[in-house]
């Protein structure tokens, strides 16, 4: 094992997290967070590179890639330093970027989502280097500043940039908060897919007292929305809950109570399991809308509902990770440090793991997520130490299994 001089401050997850929280990196601003992270990693022997991603019509975003080692096996840790806005700062018990500790908890925006996970993984690898030397292989940090934003200039472009330079990975751990109640509850081994769209129905505007002279698009829109939500798309699968579609908005752009609107629109999102792909779901949704729009009882004496369907860009495909070395190493580390056997889950929303899956097997494990995005976001100091221990045990176990 090669030796690198360890930065003693990097071995303390609390110090690491306080440093990161004090950087106001509200998406897409870097806020000093990537510079602070680089200052932790470089003394450990990491080669740190900064990459600025650009796309017309979107803000430039700074990202970071750091690697220790040149040989395989290669473990990636992925995450983000950007955070959501703080809301009304006056509602916070402590200033959101002060990283105050009170009652055994560390307060600050990003404490849970997900500067805490980064702080713990840095501490874990720093302790490993200090006690055992660098792992026999390579370890890297892939950290974006565009996860809480549109995710255009973040992980996708950073992965493409790194892969174009010849980087290849054997496995990835994403440090997102995965635990519902207690540290050790849950590992995410996959994610449902996500597909969104908008339906537009055009009618004829008129006076509410003279409906025969108008054509109310809301009547048709209600039927189309019902057709999307019922019946259920499926009953779920072995590893996934049932697919679920929600109509999230219905708008007519009309504030008057005596005017029949000329246009109605509705947006929807479906979280889908491995019964479907985005392509097969599009076909199913169009079939449901066509059937509902042609119902002769809906518009007697009038033509079928004319609707327009607009799909949102970049649907997320469903995925499931089946990699024994990765999952068993992490599960064993969690059980060793907490005494809990973690559930292997695919619940919840999407994450940047959906991009990483195309490059290597990926799982997610981090802190307890109860206060993420909330006023007074906070983490138990004891959980930071425990997560650092879990990550440390995982690093040792994974390199042992992957190098065997």
From Swiss-Prot:
Pathway(s) per entry: Amino-acid biosynthesis; L-lysine biosynthesis via DAP pathway; LL-2,6-diaminopimelate from (S)-tetrahydrodipicolinate (succinylase route): step 3/3
Note on how the cofactor is bound: Binds 2 Zn(2+) or Co(2+) ions per subunit.
InterPro entries: ArgE/DapE_CS (IPR001261), Bact_exopeptidase_dim_dom (IPR036264), DapE_proteobac (IPR005941), Peptidase_M20 (IPR002933), Peptidase_M20_dimer (IPR011650), Peptidase_M20A (IPR050072)
Gene Ontology BP annotations: diaminopimelate biosynthetic process; L-arginine biosynthetic process; lysine biosynthetic process via diaminopimelate
Requisite cofactors: Zn(2+); Co(2+)
Protein residues bound to Zn(2+) 1: 80, 113, 176
Entry EC no(s): 3.5.1.18
Superkingdom of origin: Bacteria
Single GO term (MF): zinc ion binding
Gene3D superfamilies reported for this sequence: 3.30.70.360, Zn peptidases (3.40.630.10)
Active site: 82, 147
Catalytic activity: N-succinyl-(2S,6S)-2,6-diaminopimelate + H2O = (2S,6S)-2,6-diaminopimelate + succinate
Primary enzyme class: hydrolase
Keywords tagged on the record: Amino-acid biosynthesis, Cobalt, Diaminopimelate biosynthesis, Hydrolase, Lysine biosynthesis, Metal-binding, Zinc
Binding site for Zn(2+) 2: 113, 148, 373
Functional description taken from the UniProt entry: Catalyzes the hydrolysis of N-succinyl-L,L-diaminopimelic acid (SDAP), forming succinate and LL-2,6-diaminopimelate (DAP), an intermediate involved in the bacterial biosynthesis of lysine and meso-diaminopimelic acid, an essential component of bacterial cell walls.
Family listed: Belongs to the peptidase M20A family. DapE subfamily.
Quaternary assembly: Homodimer.
Protein name as it appears in the record: Succinyl-diaminopimelate desuccinylase
Species classification: Bacteria, Pseudomonadati, Pseudomonadota, Alphaproteobacteria, Hyphomicrobiales
